[in-house]
Amino acid sequence: MLKNTLLPILFIFSSTIYAQKIDKTKDELKSGKPVDTRPPLPTEPVNQSSPSTVRESNDSFGIGGFFVEFGFYITLYAGIGDYRNEDHLYYPLSPYPYFDGKTGNYEKIDDESVLKKQLRFDLENHFLYSNNASFGNHLKGKFRPFQYLYLQTDYRELMERDKFSKTNSNLSLFQFNLGYDRLRFEKFNLGWTLGATYIANDINKAGFSYGLNTDVFAFKKVSFNSAMIWSKINGLSVNSFEFRGKYHKKNHFFSMGYENLKMGSPSYNYATFGAGIYF
């Protein structure tokens, strides 16, 4: 008897908690972090530069400049690569993964591949499911004018249902990014993205974003994809992580995976089911 009574109570309580996540995210992103504008207390140190400190800074400027320049070239190599010595950076786009039964997003250069069309458009859609009270949709488009750079847009619409109060909450998350694949091999590619994250509804705020992503073409017709994007909106983290496996069939695929969104303090976890096509 007690068990039969507790189960409905726990179900209603869990549904209410999930429905409060979106509202909590909205409230936090609207208000942001409190800014400490008070003057320093007498016991707090105040940063002041003495003349000797200024002279030491001037003396060390030359050494510091050397390390800054050195760090710049290291960063340039790590992020962009060496086009004089890394042949894979010239690998052309494939028409779609596994078009020849073995190649992923990029194929090795030969006399025929150089002449092939480089333009490609990737479109995919995924249903997001956490429970009966929390679900959503993730639409992603990737425009590849050539093998060097691409433009990517992600649109997530999240829904939460409060069965106790019979109300619904929704949140629209947009990510706009410029992408670059640093490593471009037949079976593996790794790259980064730079762009902006925007949350609509009654928040209407945006922030700078950066991310990493990779594709592994493990064996015939199957690949694995992972992507992470970090951003801040109104001083609070708005991050996304996704991992999914894809089964490819000609120029389309079916997928299953997992997504996590961290927006403010709430964290959202979803199983994903979807499909995509390459044009």
Regions found by a protein language model. Give the residues of each.
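Short, surface-exposed coil-to-beta transition loops
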Residues: 135-136, 209, 238-240
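Repeated loop/turn-to-beta-strand initiation elements of outer-membrane beta-barrel proteins
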Residues: 147-153, 185-190, 220-226, 247-256
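Short, conserved, surface-exposed binding loops centered on an aromatic residue
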Residues: 184-185, 202-204, 214-218
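Outer-membrane beta-barrel translocator/channel fold
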Residues: 155-176, 181, 192-205, 230-279
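Cleavable N-terminal export/targeting peptides
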Residues: 1-111
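Outer-membrane beta-barrel proteins
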Residues: 80-84, 105-111, 145-147, 179-184, ...
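Eukaryote-specific, low-hydrophobicity, charge-rich regions
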Residues: 92-176, 185, 189
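Short helix-loop boundary/capping segments
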Residues: 208-226
